[in-house]
UniProtKB/Swiss-Prot annotation:
Specifically methylates the N4 position of cytidine in position 1402 (C1402) of 16S rRNA. This is Ribosomal RNA small subunit methyltransferase H. One of its GO terms (cellular component) is cytoplasm. It comes from Hydrogenobaculum sp. (strain Y04AAS1). InterPro entries: RsmH, SAM-dep_MeTrfase_MraW_recog, SAM-dependent_MTases_sf. GO terms for molecular function: rRNA (cytosine-N4-)-methyltransferase activity. The gene is rsmH. GO terms for biological process: rRNA base methylation. It catalyses: cytidine(1402) in 16S rRNA + S-adenosyl-L-methionine = N(4)-methylcytidine(1402) in 16S rRNA + S-adenosyl-L-homocysteine + H(+). Belongs to the methyltransferase superfamily. RsmH family. Its EC number is 2.1.1.199. It is an enzyme of class 2 (transferase). Signal peptide: none annotated.
Amino acid sequence: MHKSVLLKEVTDFLSNPCPKIHIDATLGLGGHAKALLEVCKDTFLIGIDKDENAIEIAKEKLKGFNAVFYHGSFKDFDIVLKEEGLLYFDSILFDFGVSSLQLDEEEGFSFQREDFLDMRMDKRQQKTAYIVINTYKEKELADIFYKYGEERLSKKIARSIVEKRKKKPIETTKELVDIVSSCYPYKYSKINPATKVFQALRIEVNSELEDIKIALSKLLDFAKEGSKFAFISFHSLEDRLVKEFIKNNADKLKVCSKKPITPSDEELLYNKRARSAKLRCAKLCYNEKKDEAFDS
């Protein structure tokens, strides 16, 4: 069962005061959206997600609320706003994590299942993890694993993949896990050796970091005085982009806390997938002092 990460913290921040127009740019199964709409009855929600299955589930969950739904990337939030005849939003949420639905279904996101190497969040796109693993050159694979997964054995793993696929295509997550694991000289106790490679593949297949950059580059163009921004990231590459955005706009943004908000010990007891989550939030304030964090 999917549990929305940092649910209380996000809801408390976004609902004080309640937004008239809220964009959940990564709607998922609608957990964050429902929590906000239960508090803010008059809020108009625009929900966007790449995963069509997730949208259908969210629609059911959010029946009776004032909401519209779009199948697409969070980077296109501005196009969606224009389709609704709107010029700006009052608040926006980005949750950059993979949903439990995607991890639990046969989508190739999880190395704990034996699935076909897919990893597409949006099934309309052509590129899959299978295509990346079986057609990219050795150097391209090594660069992806190092850049997006911060994998120190990137070259060795890429070399091994290329050797293996000469005999037969690498088709399943288990095959890939076995190849990556064989490159490690000893067994890792804390994380599966394939964790970083799977992260890198997911980012490459779905253009995740590029989409984040695009979204951040136009965010302020569709915000107004007092508009709120909430970002949930799950690894340093995502968080770094958000930090840079906030830093580069320090003269316009007021952060809700100096450091990112992380899950409480209580949340981690029932939601282990939240352990790496970080929430950064800010509001657009042209006319306020920015030297102190505000209380959400």
